[in-house]
Amino acid sequence: GGLSVLADIVQHEGLARESYIYMGDMANMPYGSYSLENNTELLVEHVIKDVQFLLGNKYYRSGDARKPQTDKKQVKAIVIACNTATAFALDTVKRFLEEAGLDIGVIGVIDAGATGAFGNFSPGEDGSIAVMATDGTVKSGAYPEAIILKNRNDGQVENIRVFQQAGIGIAEAIDESHDAIDRKATSPRADY
């Protein structure tokens, strides 16, 4: 999830001296389930509110703090480290920042995932890429679109096929929701 993305960013040589704000929207997660309820507009609204928080200077040091701190610096870039949030809200976030006249880069994880998917291919090789993701990410079609576009631009693979499988409960399992994890399971779920 987002913490593994942050860990990779922090280890990048050119970014070692930067300060980071990690924001996990625990109140509205998992984002991957919003499309199951046909509620992607609410998902986009949550992501925009997340961005507004990151743009502001106020924050609370703890859950029981009575007054906000006001010393948070303006962010230089925003990484949306959730596939479903990237799929449904990235373009809206970019437009929001542009309309606000803010020169802040926004990066989504899907393009990075599409780039990484080609790591095991030799130039000109045919191949298939399997995407296992939340229902929302799969329904968005964002990964096949990004993979095909990347291949079209780079011409790395001769013929590429993309297969997707939505994982029921995958978002919850990633976040270690006790309802979604059965450590003693010996077969797939009956509703899968």
Model-predicted segments: where are they?
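Non-catalytic structural scaffold of enzyme domains
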Residues: G1-Y192
